[in-house]
């Protein structure tokens, strides 16, 4: 049995964990990255593709002896339409990819889960506070911008249209910009063990907004929000019960709205305010790149497993547990 994934995002962690759990490993990656990935001895086979259709062909070569692990690059670059052509079984719920590609559906799901979310504005004319405008898909913050009022919001939206980053204003989501500390809560929902695990917390490091603090206040540069890295974090323990409650609510709602439900890793991307409120502004329905911080396990995964347990390894551990209990079909779609 092969564990395979796309060469990007969190692929090193995923395949490192798969090898630790005794699986063969394979990677499908753009041709220009083949040399880089071949240096890692835990990757058994590396396939370079010229275009996304060829990537799907390589993935489908493993239809009878492989399991594909999805991550953000599969969602964003291979795309939901091509994912529908993938015959190889996918770990997790592939039906969730369509929801993740649509910002409005994502927020609707969070609202249904009774999770606190930022105020949203359907019409730029209604903006009366600081807002952030987000593009669809898993773009790592590319194209996102902050606006202080409706005038700045409309100006920024017109630029996105001119640059063809969006086709319609209906594609974006306009959210209140919540002031606080960003915290991205990483979970794993185990179908086999019937439990939800908090796997870690990270903070995204974004350019250029995180570099602007080093400049004098009188230098005016428009901030951008492109994710380039991640910083580890732990939360006040008193926050964790609410974090866990939100995770449970999310799992229950996905089971109801997106059958067969939440399988494996996901992330609730949040801001913690000075009042201790946790406001969730987005979710990822698969492994997130912030888990790369914890290849040797996080402060939280150690509490569940008492051994090094990355999210990548946790995925393969779940697959192994499913195989051993004859429940593999319950964790694949």
Swiss-Prot record:
Q: Name one GO molecular function term.
A: magnesium ion binding
Reaction equations catalysed: 5-amino-1-(5-phospho-beta-D-ribosyl)imidazole-4-carboxamide + formate + ATP = 5-formamido-1-(5-phospho-D-ribosyl)imidazole-4-carboxamide + ADP + phosphate
Q: Which Gene3D superfamilies match?
A: 3.40.50.20, ATP-grasp fold, A domain, ATP-grasp fold, B domain
> Could you give the cofactor binding note from the entry?
Binds 1 Mg(2+) or Mn(2+) ion per subunit.
Q: Which parts of the chain span the membrane according to its record?
A: none
Biological process according to GO: 'de novo' IMP biosynthetic process
Q: Does the keyword Metal-binding apply?
A: yes
Q: Where is the ATP-grasp domain?
A: 94-324
Q: Is Lyase found in the keyword set?
A: no
Which pathway, per its entry?
A: Purine metabolism; IMP biosynthesis via de novo pathway; 5-formamido-1-(5-phospho-D-ribosyl)imidazole-4-carboxamide from 5-amino-1-(5-phospho-D-ribosyl)imidazole-4-carboxamide (formate route): step 1/1
Q: Which residues take part in binding ATP?
A: 124-184, 206
Q: Which cofactor does it need?
A: Mg(2+); Mn(2+)
Q: Where does Mg(2+) bind?
A: 269, 282
Tell me its EC number(s), please. 6.3.4.23
Residues at which 5-amino-1-(5-phospho-beta-D-ribosyl)imidazole-4-carboxamide binds = 9, 73, 230
Please report which protein family the annotation says this sequence is part of: Belongs to the phosphohexose mutase family.
This chain's function reads: Catalyzes the ATP- and formate-dependent formylation of 5-aminoimidazole-4-carboxamide-1-beta-d-ribofuranosyl 5'-monophosphate (AICAR) to 5-formaminoimidazole-4-carboxamide-1-beta-d-ribofuranosyl 5'-monophosphate (FAICAR) in the absence of folates.
Recorded hits in NCBIfam families, A to Z, give:
PRK13278.1-1
The protein in question is named 5-formaminoimidazole-4-carboxamide-1-(beta)-D-ribofuranosyl 5'-monophosphate synthetase
